[in-house]
């Protein structure tokens, strides 16, 4: 009994996958050859060419739909296949986006409808009127447009040349040289910042010194030189008192004997 899930497969040792190409699976297109089946109603009344059966508007069919490959601007034109209800002959009709309608293609012809013919005629007349209303371009306008186009083209070519020059310059530049230049720029900016900081600090010191060594009137107090200045000896307080007493006319209240003794002591000391 074979394995149900086929988990293990035997591969012989002499198997070469390159000899046997992989199988190409055919895409499943369905019973209608890849055409979609849609449910629709006939958009107009028609008459079959094979049996002459009339198919009225609004009759429901299971139609096959496909793209014709043609487009009106960007709108795809579609084709629908139906069969006659009497003889089973194939009838096709396509979409008409230009007139917002449908048109019979093969197997049947559209019945005469006066409102439809009138509508088509009005549409054609309006289209012709629009074409006639468009003024013919003047020769001067053509020349101006041509000059503008040439100017625009020159600007585009200049921009392209600049881009080419930039790319060539970049290709010529060595990576090491670019790194060295970047480093130099970085070091130069750092040195500039340091010099600015030093200058700012010096200005701050000068401001503080001016604020400290200036008087209330705003005059600057200058520092005396140590070599030119001479320190003066301060007089003793006893000498000051004696000088004051000598200059003043204060009477001497000492007794005569004490005064004589004092004078004698001074003479002895001298």
Swiss-Prot record:
GO terms for biological process: generation of catalytic spliceosome for first transesterification step; mRNA cis splicing, via spliceosome; RNA splicing. The keyword Zinc applies. It holds the Pfam family Saf4_Yju2. One of its GO terms (cellular component) is nucleus. GO terms for molecular function: metal ion binding. Zn(2+) binds at residues 48, 51, 84, 87. The keyword Repressor does not apply. InterPro entries: Saf4/Yju2, Yju2. Residues 1-32, 251-270 are annotated as: Disordered. Residues 258-270 have a biased composition (Basic residues). Component of the spliceosome. Present in the activated B complex, the catalytically activated B* complex which catalyzes the branching, the catalytic step 1 C complex catalyzing the exon ligation, and the postcatalytic P complex containing the ligated exons (mRNA) and the excised lariat intron. Part of the spliceosome which catalyzes two sequential transesterification reactions, first the excision of the non-coding intron from pre-mRNA and then the ligation of the coding exons to form the mature mRNA. Plays a role in stabilizing the structure of the spliceosome catalytic core and docking of the branch helix into the active site, producing 5'-exon and lariat intron-3'-intermediates. Belongs to the CWC16 family. YJU2 subfamily. This is Splicing factor YJU2. The gene is cwf16.
């Amino acid at each position: 009994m074979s394995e149900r899930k086929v988990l293990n497969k035997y591969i012989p040792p002499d198997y070469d996958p390159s000899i046997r190409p992989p199988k190409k699976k055919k895409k499943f297109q369905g019973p209608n050859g890849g055409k979609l089946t849609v449910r629709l109603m006939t958009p107009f009344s028609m008459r079959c060419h094979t049996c002459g059966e009339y198919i009225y508007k609004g009759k429901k069919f299971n139609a096959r739909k496909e793209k014709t490959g043609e487009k009106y601007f960007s709108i795809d034109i579609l084709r629908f296949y139906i069969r006659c209800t009497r003889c089973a002959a194939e009838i096709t009709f396509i979409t008409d986006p230009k007139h917002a309608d449908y048109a019979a293609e093969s197997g049947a012809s559209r019945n005469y409808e006066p409102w439809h013919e009138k509508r088509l005629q009005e549409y054609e007349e309006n289209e012709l009127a629009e074409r006639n209303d468009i003024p013919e371009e003047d020769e001067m306008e053509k020349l101006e447009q041509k000059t503008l186009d040439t100017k625009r083209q020159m600007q585009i070519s200049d921009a392209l040349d600049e881009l080419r020059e930039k790319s060539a310059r970049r290709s010529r530049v060595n990576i090491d040289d670019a790194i060295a230049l970047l480093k130099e720029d970085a070091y130069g900016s750092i040195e500039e910042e340091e010099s600015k900081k030093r200058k700012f600090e010096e200005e701050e010191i000068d401001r503080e010194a001016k604020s400290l060594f200036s008087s209330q009137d705003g005059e600057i107090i200058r520092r005396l030189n140590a070599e030119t200045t001479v320190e003066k000896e301060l007089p003793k307080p006893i000498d000051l008192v004696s000088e004051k007493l000598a200059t003043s006319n204060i009477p001497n209240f000492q007794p005569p004997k004490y005064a004589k003794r004092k004078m004698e002591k001074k003479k002895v000391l001298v």
